[in-house]
Structure formats: C-alpha cells, structure tokens
Amino acid sequence: MKVKMLSRNPDNYVRETKLDLQRVPRNYDPALHPFEVPREYIRALNATKLERVFAKPFLASLDGHRDGVNCLAKHPEKLATVLSGACDGEVRIWNLTQRNCIRTIQAHEGFVRGICTRFCGTSFFTVGDDKTVKQWKMDGPGYGDEEEPLHTILGKTVYTGIDHHWKEAVFATCGQQVDIWDEQRTNPICSMTWGFDSISSVKFNPIETFLLGSCASDRNIVLYDMRQATPLKKVILDMRTNTICWNPMEAFIFTAANEDYNLYTFDMRALDTPVMVHMDHVSAVLDVDYSPTGKEFVSASFDKSIRIFPVDKSRSREVYHTKRMQHVICVKWTSDSKYIMCGSDEMNIRLWKANASEKLGVLTSREKAAKDYNQKLKEKFQHYPHIKRIARHRHLPKSIYSQIQEQRIMKEARRRKEVNRIKHSKPGSVPLVSEKKKHVVAVVK
C-alpha cells in the first residue's frame, strides 16, 4: 500500500535562534487582497500624523556672544567645528558635539562683516568695519601666548564680504569693488567693478571655481570670470539682493535672497528669466545656503523665521521659528546635510534638524525598513486632500500669520486689477507678463 506524505523543509519556517522573528508565509497575489489600497491609505494617513507628532526640530541654542551674530562659517573638514562673527568684532569657534565655545577672538573693532575658512581648514579669514582683512590660525595659540593674526591687510575702504577659493590660495573681498587677493601678498592681484554702488556679498562657484558672483546695492547681481579679470554679465532686479549662494551640484545654478520677500533661482546661461521664484517669507530675505545634496536650500529672513525650500518648488516645505528668536541674519546647512544653524540678532546661534521628525542616532534594520516604507506610502498618497492638509499644516506666530493674510489680499488685488485692465483694453495692447519675468528689469552683458 502506497501512502503519500506531506513534507516541508524546516529551513523555510524554523528560526535559527529564539531571538529571530517567526517566518510568516505570504501570498502576494493582488486577487487575494482586494482592500490593499484602503489599508495603505490608512497607513499613509497614520504615518503623516505621526510625522507631525514627532516633528521636534529644535536641538540646541549656543549662547555666549555679547552682540548680534552677523556671519557664520563651516569648517571644510570637521563637521563639529563652526565659526561665528558678531557685531562687536568678536569671533567664536564652537564645538557642535559638546555644544560649547572652544575659542574666543577679539578680531575687529566694530562689526565682523564676513568670515570664511581656507579650503584645507588650517586657517580662516575675517573682514570688519575697521578696513582690515585678517588671517587666523584654526588651532589656538599655546599656553601663555597671545592671540595674534597670522597676516593682516590694511585696506583703503570698508570690506563688506569675503569668500575663499575652493582649490587655490586665493580669496575675494567686496566693498566698493571686488578684489582678488593672493594669500602671500598685501595688494590685490586684480580688482573688478561694474557700477558705482557698494557690493554687499561675493561668492565663489564651488564647481567652476574661477567664476564668482556678487550682489550690489544698485539691485545688480554681477558674475565675474577670475581668469579674464573682467565682469561677464549682470542682471538687474526690481529690488536689492542681499546675498547669493551657488548650487554645489549644478555649476550654473545659483539662488539670490532678495529684499522683496522672495528668492530667485537663476541659470547663469539665461539670466532673463529665473528658473524658479520661491515665495513664502513675509519680510526681506537676508541669507541663503544650499544643502550639500543640491536638492534643497535654507533661507533666513527678517520676519524671525527660517524656511527650507526644495529647489524645484516655489513654496517652502518647512518653517522654523521660536518665541525668542529675533531677526535671523545668517544661516548655514551643515556638510552632512542633517542639521541647520542660524544666527540671529538676539546673540544666539540655534541648531535645528533638517528633517523635523527624523530620529537621531543609529537606526536598526527594522526601523530603516519601516521608515522607507512609510516614506513611500506618503509619496504615493501625498495629493489626497486629507493627507495633504495634515502634511502642510504648520503653527505660525501671529505676526507672520497676519502678514501672510495681508500679502494674500494685496496679491489678489493686483491680479484683479491686471485682469480688469486686460478686459477693458484693446486685444493685444496689454501684454501678459509671467510671474517669473515680472521681477527682472534687464540683463546687461
């Protein structure tokens, strides 16, 4: 008599140790799971709600300055080291891991207008209202030694900004003109100017390192070529630009922080139209800095908040504010793309998470898998009204909220006036101007 026996391979269901999870057989045939989409929708909704519950972006406040923080700089090789310059001429070096100040330098008389590090991280440069450029060692002096600069350059005018070349021993300063300096010389190797107004900021391109951009008080953004020692082109906007920042991953893209509450992302090959206009701030934008990934940037504003924008979106994905934080003067995104630092005029430097609900520290494999799964679910259902409303909701201070309502009314009034003008004019006599082109006055080559 032949008997047929059911047999299973123990490797398919027996755990190796009692700490392992029980293996559960699953059949992924869609016909057997008719309610898969409703289940995923509920999971996406719960994941979105939990993201808002765990959104605690504020990490630390670094206090010690006796005046407003005017500028920040990152160490090119050490993630934990940050430099800050204040309005009383004091420069401090901070350790972000220990969250304390490790060195204090009285660098200038008056404001520290700019600070930048050398590309190798051995020294840093500062400029101030006392018409000097000073180079300092990154490592402090020995016990009993006085704090002295390595090198001091006495200028003829006030310098308002400084930036170092990404690969060579060359740096640029700005004031009445843009000067290019060799570190070993006390006179500029070349000077470039276009116009007569003072220049507030200068930045080297991190990819095409011979290119640099500057913004002036006469509403210009000027691009220079260091090899030819001449200006290339300039774009004139409606209002003054405070600073610019180059995209670290795309050589031709830069973002300008403007006085008209907007940020403009330009492609330097076609300056007549911005790639994107970023609108959400309700006061002048004072500083901007890119994430190392080049996908997002953070902006600091006079409206006492900082916002994180995706490069390809006109609206911010995140806004950070606190009760005590006043006008935010400077902002930096750390080199590991995880944290944001901002300096404000109530003398504090604040440290934030780049992703408000991110869990810090080492994640287990199951935590990583759950995080990735929830992220995919949120992307899949992001346009559903209920999920979209929860994901976009932010608590704002009353001052910012009321200004947003006021700006919305003004914008609607302008739109209505434009529509009426077109309606009651001869067809074709009133041109339609897109939002992107409205703010560009001219491009000069």
Swiss-Prot record:
<dbReference type="InterPro" id="IPR019775">
    <property type="entry name" value="WD40_repeat_CS"/>
</dbReference>
<dbReference type="InterPro" id="IPR001680">
    <property type="entry name" value="WD40_rpt"/>
</dbReference>
<dbReference type="GO" id="GO:0046697">
    <property type="term" value="P:decidualization"/>
</dbReference>
<dbReference type="GO" id="GO:0006364">
    <property type="term" value="P:rRNA processing"/>
</dbReference>
<dbReference type="GO" id="GO:0030054">
    <property type="term" value="C:cell junction"/>
</dbReference>
<dbReference type="GO" id="GO:0032040">
    <property type="term" value="C:small-subunit processome"/>
</dbReference>
<feature type="repeat" description="WD 1">
    <location>
        <begin position="64"/>
        <end position="104"/>
    </location>
</feature>
<dbReference type="Pfam" id="PF04158">
    <property type="entry name" value="Sof1"/>
</dbReference>
<dbReference type="InterPro" id="IPR051733">
    <property type="entry name" value="WD_repeat_DCAF13/WDSOF1"/>
</dbReference>
<keyword id="KW-0853">WD repeat</keyword>
<protein>
    <recommendedName>
        <fullName>DDB1- and CUL4-associated factor 13</fullName>
    </recommendedName>
</protein>
<dbReference type="GO" id="GO:0005813">
    <property type="term" value="C:centrosome"/>
</dbReference>
<keyword id="KW-0687">Ribonucleoprotein</keyword>
<feature type="repeat" description="WD 4">
    <location>
        <begin position="194"/>
        <end position="234"/>
    </location>
</feature>
<comment type="subunit">
    <text>Part of the small subunit (SSU) processome, composed of more than 70 proteins and the RNA chaperone small nucleolar RNA (snoRNA) U3. Component of the DCX(DCAF13) E3 ubiquitin ligase complex, at least composed of CUL4 (CUL4A or CUL4B), DDB1, DCAF13 and RBX1. Interacts (via WD40 domain) with DDB1. Interacts with ESR1 and LATS1.</text>
</comment>
<keyword id="KW-0833">Ubl conjugation pathway</keyword>
<comment type="similarity">
    <text>Belongs to the WD repeat DCAF13/WDSOF1 family.</text>
</comment>
<feature type="repeat" description="WD 3">
    <location>
        <begin position="149"/>
        <end position="191"/>
    </location>
</feature>
<dbReference type="GO" id="GO:0043161">
    <property type="term" value="P:proteasome-mediated ubiquitin-dependent protein catabolic process"/>
</dbReference>
<dbReference type="GO" id="GO:0001555">
    <property type="term" value="P:oocyte growth"/>
</dbReference>
<feature type="repeat" description="WD 2">
    <location>
        <begin position="107"/>
        <end position="146"/>
    </location>
</feature>
<dbReference type="InterPro" id="IPR015943">
    <property type="entry name" value="WD40/YVTN_repeat-like_dom_sf"/>
</dbReference>
<keyword id="KW-0698">rRNA processing</keyword>
<feature type="modified residue" description="N6-acetyllysine">
    <location>
        <position position="49"/>
    </location>
</feature>
<keyword id="KW-0677">Repeat</keyword>
<keyword id="KW-0690">Ribosome biogenesis</keyword>
<dbReference type="GO" id="GO:0007056">
    <property type="term" value="P:spindle assembly involved in female meiosis"/>
</dbReference>
<feature type="region of interest" description="Required for nucleolar location">
    <location>
        <begin position="353"/>
        <end position="441"/>
    </location>
</feature>
<feature type="repeat" description="WD 7">
    <location>
        <begin position="323"/>
        <end position="362"/>
    </location>
</feature>
<dbReference type="GO" id="GO:0003723">
    <property type="term" value="F:RNA binding"/>
</dbReference>
<dbReference type="GO" id="GO:0005654">
    <property type="term" value="C:nucleoplasm"/>
</dbReference>
<keyword id="KW-0007">Acetylation</keyword>
<dbReference type="GO" id="GO:0030331">
    <property type="term" value="F:nuclear estrogen receptor binding"/>
</dbReference>
<dbReference type="GO" id="GO:0005829">
    <property type="term" value="C:cytosol"/>
</dbReference>
<feature type="repeat" description="WD 6">
    <location>
        <begin position="280"/>
        <end position="319"/>
    </location>
</feature>
<dbReference type="GO" id="GO:0005730">
    <property type="term" value="C:nucleolus"/>
</dbReference>
<dbReference type="InterPro" id="IPR036322">
    <property type="entry name" value="WD40_repeat_dom_sf"/>
</dbReference>
<comment type="pathway">
    <text>Protein modification; protein ubiquitination.</text>
</comment>
<dbReference type="Pfam" id="PF00400">
    <property type="entry name" value="WD40"/>
</dbReference>
<dbReference type="GO" id="GO:0016567">
    <property type="term" value="P:protein ubiquitination"/>
</dbReference>
<feature type="repeat" description="WD 5">
    <location>
        <begin position="236"/>
        <end position="276"/>
    </location>
</feature>
<dbReference type="GO" id="GO:0000462">
    <property type="term" value="P:maturation of SSU-rRNA from tricistronic rRNA transcript (SSU-rRNA, 5.8S rRNA, LSU-rRNA)"/>
</dbReference>
